[in-house]
Swiss-Prot record:
Swiss-Prot/TrEMBL keywords: ATP-binding, Cytoplasm, Kinase, Magnesium, Metal-binding, Nucleotide-binding, Phosphoprotein, Serine/threonine-protein kinase, Transferase, Tyrosine-protein kinase
Protein name: Dual specificity mitogen-activated protein kinase kinase 5
Effect of G67A: Loss of MAP3K2/MAP3K3 binding
Organism: Mus musculus (Mouse)
UniProt domain PB1: residue ranges: 18-109
Length: 448
């Protein structure tokens, strides 16, 4: 048992902090830090890298008062962990209890053979760590671009792949600080979607990108876009994912209900999978729903996703037009806000237009909040019953309840008659619709 003599929270600056790094099946290593409140997330990862040199650690966890594991993968979440720990220490001191070290649990990426499910390899061209002992420098920069680049290298170092293996073809779109290309991976012959991102971007965008990588490594679902890996060259990071030849749903016109129902099943299953990991998508919209000619439907672009801490969050990110009323109002939100976005997205796909006529979406930019006030003030739009089935109308109506707690929970979504009706595994319906739509698009474009 280890004792810490900690004074009031305001005096923590001068106190010694002991962090106990738990090693799976091998005990633990204690690390003494003399300036705990100034400790950075990057510093902890560097020391974990020395304790576990064979693993690539991208995050770590600690336990809250209920014994639940909370993930730390940024300086902001690091501060939240330290604040929680110091408040616990103060309470223990008041009660005359023994003070335990701060226990953390490294979370390493899966081994390359297990993680890289699509058979590609990755090379970030990263050099070895410059730290040789578990000592933290008090002068390390907290928000430098160099540090962010090193963090990217740390996460992505898991194989052998370079830019010379990639042949870029068409531009698929823009977003989240980068451009997405259709590309050919020469050694494997695979077609990829490659998001290329310049690093001279805002720190907030860097944080979003890091979040996306973390979630892509974690996810293993047939309803989430497949992650091949990434490579780092000069001032660019390239993220390689599965290519969906049908593209995103925002480019399609009005979708028939029998097709939309089967698409909805896949999207709900994808969201339910994320929610089971305590992850909010936060940017559910048609352009982040991809289809292919095989009839598969997958969620993509987790650039604004993050671990759901204590089942609630309070930040401003995402695409305003699809935000739930509580998000537009700046209130707390959780899973039920994703449910609203699900509802308004499928209402748009069913109608072939955005459900609020007074809102003209400006593609690629966030809208002024005053233009979205109608979503907060007005009653939710309703699908016309004469044009759509009663189960579908009810599904959308429930998802778009103004009060978050009145919207369906994940298990209620999967059990809704509309979802149950189309949960038949019939991907042929979606496949035929995608192929037909692509053929119509090609015929309208004419010969090249």
């Amino acid at each position: 048992m280890l004792w810490l003599a900690l004074g009031p929270f305001c005096a923590m600056e001068n106190q010694v902090l002991v962090i106990r790094i738990k090693i799976p099946n091998s005990g633990a290593v204690d690390w003494t830090v003399h300036s705990g409140p100034q400790l950075l997330f990057r510093d902890v990862l560097d020391v974990i890298g020395q304790v576990l040199p064979e693993a690539t650690t991208t995050a770590f966890e600690y336990e809250d008062e209920d014994g639940d594991r909370i993930t730390v993968r940024s300086d902001e979440e690091m501060k939240a962990m330290l604040s929680y720990y110091y408040s616990t220490v103060m309470e223990q001191q008041v009660n005359g209890q023994l003070i335990e070290p701060l226990q953390i649990f490294p979370r390493a990426c899966k081994p390359p053979g297990e993680r890289n499910i699509h058979g590609l390899k990755v090379n970030t061209r990263a050099g070895p760590s410059q730290h040789t002992s578990p000592v933290v420098s008090d002068s390390l920069p907290s928000n430098s671009l160099k540090k962010s680049s090193a963090e990217l290298r740390k996460i992505l170092a898991n194989g052998q792949m370079n830019e010379q293996d990639i042949r870029y073809r068409d531009t698929l779109g823009h977003g989240n600080g980068g451009t997405v290309y259709k590309a050919h991976h020469v050694p494997s012959g695979k077609i990829l979607a490659v998001k290329v991102i310049l690093l001279d971007i805002t720190l907030e965008l860097q944080k979003q990108i890091m979040s996306e990588l973390e979630i892509l490594y974690k996810c293993d679902s047939s309803y989430i876009i497949g992650f091949y890996g990434a490579f780092f060259v000069e001032n660019r990071i390239s993220i390689c994912t599965e290519f969906m030849d049908g593209g995103s749903l925002d480019v399609y016109r009005k979708i028939p209900e029998h097709v939309l129902g089967r698409i909805a099943v896949a999207v709900v299953k994808g969201l339910t999978y994320l929610w089971s990991l305590k992850i909010l998508h936060r940017d559910v919209k048609p352009s982040n729903m991809l289809v292919n000619t095989g009839g598969q439907v997958k969620l993509c672009d987790f650039g604004v996703s993050t671990q759901l801490v204590n089942s609630i969050a309070k930040t401003y990110v995402g695409t305003n037009a699809y935000m739930a009323p509580e998000r537009i109002s700046g209130e707390q939100y959780g899973i039920h806000s994703d449910v609203w976005s699900l509802g308004i997205s499928f209402m748009e796909l069913a109608l072939g237009r955005f459900p609020y006529p007074q809102i003209q979406k400006n593609q690629g930019s966030l809208m002024p909040l005053q233009l979205l006030q109608c979503i907060v003030d007005e009653d939710s739009p309703v699908l016309p019953l004469g044009e759509f089935s009663e189960p579908f109308v009810h599904f959308i109506t429930q998802c778009m309840r103004k009060q978050p707690k009145e919207r369906p929970a994940p298990e209620e979504l999967m059990g809704h008659p509309f979802i149950v009706q189309f949960n038949d595994g019939n991907s042929t319906v979606v496949s035929m619709w995608v192929c037909r739509a692509l053929e119509e698009r090609r015929s309208q474009q004419g010969p090249p």
